[in-house]
A protein has these predicted regions:
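Interaction-interface detector
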Residues: 1-135
């Protein structure tokens, strides 16, 4: 089953729906993006891959359009990819993984005997660094 993102005039995703696979032909319809575009006035439908995250296909297939689209994501026509919202102004887009990266890498996390993290961190935009939660 394919999925389609509806984008507005600013290329922002407003809705994602399941739909027909691109190889299906029903009632002579062969272009499902064009078909679904006719179903939402003022919006454009673009196929998205449920199995694509951060530029990789999670089951080993071919990644498609950077990320599975989500509401609020932006479709970048130059990259042909769905980009999540920028979490902080200081973060920059990794154009090969299609994700935002902090200016300071996430700290290495120690794991306990059960393999669970002993600490987690939160980004502080004003300080420009990660801080341990609960510390």
């Amino acid at each position: 089953m394919a999925h389609y993102a509806f984008i507005d005039e600013n290329n922002v995703v407003v809705e994602v729906i399941p739909g027909r696979d691109e190889w299906e032909i029903v009632d002579g319809i062969t272009d499902w993006e064009a078909y679904y575009t006719t179903k939402r006035e003022g919006l454009r439908a673009i196929r998205t891959s449920y199995n694509t995250v951060a530029g990789e296909h999670i089951t080993g297939g071919v990644p498609f359009r950077g990320n599975y689209a989500g509401k609020g994501f932006t479709y970048d026509e130059d990259l042909d990819a769905f980009i999540p919202p920028q979490p902080y102004p200081s973060w920059t887009l990794n154009e090969s993984k299609f994700v935002w990266e902090s200016p300071v890498p996430y700290p290495e996390v120690e794991l306990d005997e059960d393999g669970l993290p002993v600490a987690s961190y939160v980004w502080d935009e004003e300080a420009g660094d990660w801080f341990e939660m609960g510390a």
